[in-house]
Swiss-Prot record:
SMART domains: Haemolytic. Keywords: Cell membrane, Membrane. This is Putative membrane protein insertion efficiency factor. It comes from the Bacteria. Could be involved in insertion of integral membrane proteins into the membrane. Pfam families: YidD. GO terms for cellular component: plasma membrane. The lineage of its organism: Bacteria, Bacillati, Actinomycetota, Actinomycetes, Kitasatosporales. Its main location: membrane. HAMAP family: UPF0161_YidD. Coiled coil: none annotated. It comes from Streptomyces griseus subsp. griseus (strain JCM 4626 / CBS 651.72 / NBRC 13350 / KCC S-0626 / ISP 5235). Residues 82-119 are annotated as: Disordered. It is a peripheral membrane protein. The keyword Membrane applies.
Amino acid sequence: MKYPLLALIKLYQWTISPLLGPVCRYYPSCSHYGYTSIDRHGAIKGTALTAWRILRCNPWSPGGVDHVPPRKRPRWHELLRNALRGEKGGESAADVPSGGSVSEPPGPAAETSPNAQGA
C-alpha cells in the first residue's frame, strides 16, 4: 500500500505542483513531507502525519521548518533486544587474553613520556 501512495505523490509533484508554484508555508514542502513520512513510517502512520501537516499548512499558520519525526522503536522492542543480548552470555573478545605465549618487548610508544608532543 505504501508504494501506490508514493507514486501518487510523485505524480502530483510532477504534474500539478509546477502549475501552482511554491505555495507551501513550510520547509520541506507538504508533498515532500508526505513522501518522506510515508516512506519512513509506512502507509497508515505516514498518511496520518501528512494529513496533520496539510491541516496545519494554512494562511493563518506562521510556517517554518518542520521535518518528519524519526521512526521510534516501541519500548517492548528495546526490552526484548536487551534480554536476548543478556542470554547470549560468554566472554567478549576484549575479556579474553591474546593467545601469544611469547611476550613482545615494549615498543617506542611505551618509552615516550606522556607529555611528549609527536609529529
